[in-house]
Amino acid sequence: MIERLRGALASASFPVMALLLLSAIVVYPLWTMLFLGAVFAYIVRPVALRINRRIPYLSVSIILAMIVVIMPLVGILVFTVDSIINSAPSLLSLAGSIHVPGAGNLQPSAENTLANLRTVLRDILSGSLNYVVAILQSVPMISLQLFVFLSSTFYFARDGKRLVGYIRTLIPEETRPFMERMASETERVLLSIFYGHFLTALAIGLMAAVGFHLLGYPYAILLGIMTGLFQLIPVIGPWAAYTPLSIYDFVTGNILRGVLVLIFGLFLSTIDIYLRPKLSGKYADIHPMIFLVGFLGGPVVWGVAGFIVGPLVLGLAYAALEAYRMESGGEEVQ
């Protein structure tokens, strides 16, 4: 037993495994940003290669592609935080001053219900504002994570092909077919998640912002962003944004706008029902429950980044299982 232990310690694999373990400990606090960097590099690289046809410097092309792809997302995030901070006092005041025509004639139970609704709305707005303030208080850590994210996106986009080639040389010959199949399935799953969920949410959010503005709602862009976020959650969808607006209009006596926003919301939901499965199923038919669990469980483990990391991790696990099923000759599930 002791001789076998000595042999294991003296073998070449022991220092390699020990160093890999130490490296994992070093990388662990930042692995979320590294993971996101690898995912965004997958999106940035094709754009950079197109730019590289006109600009002969790949590094410059990647930086320009990152500006094209990532900066709009950063702008939306900054605008959302700024809108919540600036509009929260007005919304809190509005929530406390909601007046229902004929409220004096309502039964006490109905009056209590309205009072409870005001309280819940104020609590939600206050909680959202406190959450944003808490995030802003951790600006140094966020800045570090953002730096790691941008740096990893750049280097993965520039040297990712070499990294994949290096990893391929480490894979034993007998397992390469499985790994190739897994890489193919992973690509299909990533495209399905990106086009079927994130791109659909972006389209729904943009249409919602325009529609809410035309209907005369204040903070239409913020409402559009919220609609896009709700769209990411399969079970919820855009109705979670337009239904409260419709109820508010009905309660405050603006019946016409309440009906119009309800019709507009049904239009958004119809687009969601049609567009999401059409785009997602074009690449990989992922069950909505996988995305839902990842979307809700991810933030619990990884914070705000978990909204993206959670679905991707479960999607990659699904891709690995699908590759294993196909490699072992499993039948197609109907």
Swiss-Prot record:
It comes from the Archaea. The keyword Membrane applies. It is a multi-pass membrane protein. Pfam families: AI-2E_transport (PF01594). It is found in: Cell membrane. Its main location: membrane. The chain crosses the membrane at residues 24-44, 60-80, 84-104, 131-151, 189-209, 220-240, 255-275, 289-309. Keywords: Cell membrane, Membrane, Transmembrane, Transmembrane helix, Transport. GO terms for cellular component: plasma membrane. Disulfide bonds: none annotated. InterPro entries: AI-2E-like. The keyword Transport applies. Belongs to the autoinducer-2 exporter (AI-2E) (TC 2.A.86) family. This is Putative transport protein MTH_1211. It comes from Methanothermobacter thermautotrophicus (strain ATCC 29096 / DSM 1053 / JCM 10044 / NBRC 100330 / Delta H).
